[in-house]
Amino acid sequence: MESTLGSDLARLVRVWRALIDPRLKPLELTQTHWVTLYNINRLPPEQSQIQLAKAIGIEQPSLVRTLDQLEEKGLITRHTCANDRRAKRIKLTEQSSPIIEQVDGVICSTRKEILGGISSDEIAVLSGLIDKLEKNIIQLQTK
């Protein structure tokens, strides 16, 4: 029987995010919005749209619509990069701070619930295996 590990991991991410979605509904954020804000907050300040798209794992054109919506909500600003006028840098606004705190809180509490009953050693082993899988995939992509 062939391994369904890739499908299993993809399904895990889907159900994990699906659990978080209703918990963030009061903030009026779609999954795309909160995933984008979460990643902007985790990356070094003023990342480019290209870097953010890579971090999230989506194509840049798909990201642009989400960034337009977040900018309309007053949660981010974008400005042209001084070195490359084609590139745009993304910055969180002060208005986004309380929302980011709530998003982080929901994500952290949900993570604790999901990982309940799993030892820190087991989590470390799983994280190590995921890192190895990612490295293998990256090596295969560069061949």
Swiss-Prot record:
Residues 2-135 form the HTH marR-type domain. It comes from the Bacteria. This is Transcriptional regulator SlyA. One of its GO terms (biological process) is response to stress. SUPFAM superfamilies: Winged helix' DNA-binding domain. One of its GO terms (molecular function) is DNA binding. Belongs to the SlyA family. Residues 49-72 bind DNA. The keyword Nucleotide-binding does not apply. Transcription regulator that can specifically activate or repress expression of target genes. Pfam families: MarR (PF01047). Homodimer. Keywords: Activator, DNA-binding, Repressor, Transcription, Transcription regulation. It comes from Yersinia pestis bv. Antiqua (strain Antiqua). The keyword Nucleotide-binding does not apply.
